[in-house]
Regions:
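Accessory alpha-helical/coil subdomains and C-terminal extensions
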Residues: 2-21, 26, 30-129
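C-terminal non-catalytic interaction/assembly regions of soluble proteins
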Residues: 110-178
Length: 178
C-alpha cells in the first residue's frame, strides 16, 4: 500500500506542478498518511516540492508564509507545499479563523482547518498570490497496486508457506465465524 500511495501522490503532484507552472500559482497539496508524514516526505522529495509540512514536526504558519513569500520574490511564483493530513496537530498557535474572518473569508465556528484554508491564509499573507489547494485523499487509496506493492502483499503468504512442516503452524490461521 505504501509504494502505491507514494506513486499516486507523486503522479498527482507532478501534474499539479505542471499546471502551476503554466499559470504561475503556488499550490498546497495534502496527502493522506494519518499521523505519519512518510508519504508526504517521499512525495515532496520525488517531485522537488519547495516546502513540506508533516505531523511529526512543529511548524508555524508565519514561517511557511515567509518562505513562500521569499520564493515568490525570487521569481518562483509556482512553489509547491506538500502537507500531510494531521499536520495541524503540531501547528504553532495561530488564530486562523479570526485571521481569515478579519481578512474577507468567512469561516464558521467548528470548521476544522484544511488545505483550502491554509491556501487562503497564504494568499493573504503573500500579497494576494493565487495560492491553490488540492487534497489527493482517497485517490491514493483506490489505485491499482504497483508491482512492489503487490509483491509486498504476497510476501507474508510466501513466508507462511515456507514454514517447516513440523511446525504447529503448518496451515494458515482461519478466522472464527460466529
Amino acid at each position: 500500500g505504501y509504494d502505491t500511495a507514494v506513486n499516486v501522490c507523486v503522479e498527482a503532484v507532478r501534474s499539479i506542478r505542471a499546471t502551476s507552472r503554466s499559470h504561475d500559482r503556488p499550490h498546497v497539496v495534502q496527502v493522506m498518511g494519518r499521523n505519519c508524514g512518510d508519504i508526504a516526505m517521499k512525495t515532496a522529495i520525488a517531485t522537488g516540492a519547495e516546502m513540506l509540512v508533516v505531523p511529526e514536526m512543529e511548524w508555524d504558519v508565519d514561517e511557511v508564509a515567509a518562505r513562500l513569500n521569499h520564493l515568490i520574490e525570487q521569481g518562483n511564483t509556482r512553489a509547491t507545499l506538500v502537507i500531510s493530513e494531521h499536520c495541524w496537530d503540531n501547528m504553532k498557535p495561530f488564530d486562523w479563523r479570526k485571521f481569515l474572518n478579519d481578512n474577507g473569508k468567512t469561516v464558521y465556528p467548528g470548521e476544522p482547518i484544511s488545505a483550502e484554508y491554509l491556501a487562503s491564509i497564504l494568499k493573504r499573507k503573500c500579497g494576494g498570490a493565487e495560492v491553490r489547494s488540492t487534497v489527493i485523499g482517497y485517490t491514493q487509496r483506490g489505485a491499482q497496486p504497483t508491482a512492489q506493492g503487490g509483491t509486498a502483499v504476497c510476501q507474508p503468504v510466501r513466508c507462511w508457506n515456507q514454514a517447516p512442516a513440523s511446525s504447529s503452524a503448518s496451515s494458515p490461521p482461519t478466522a472464527a465465524v460466529s
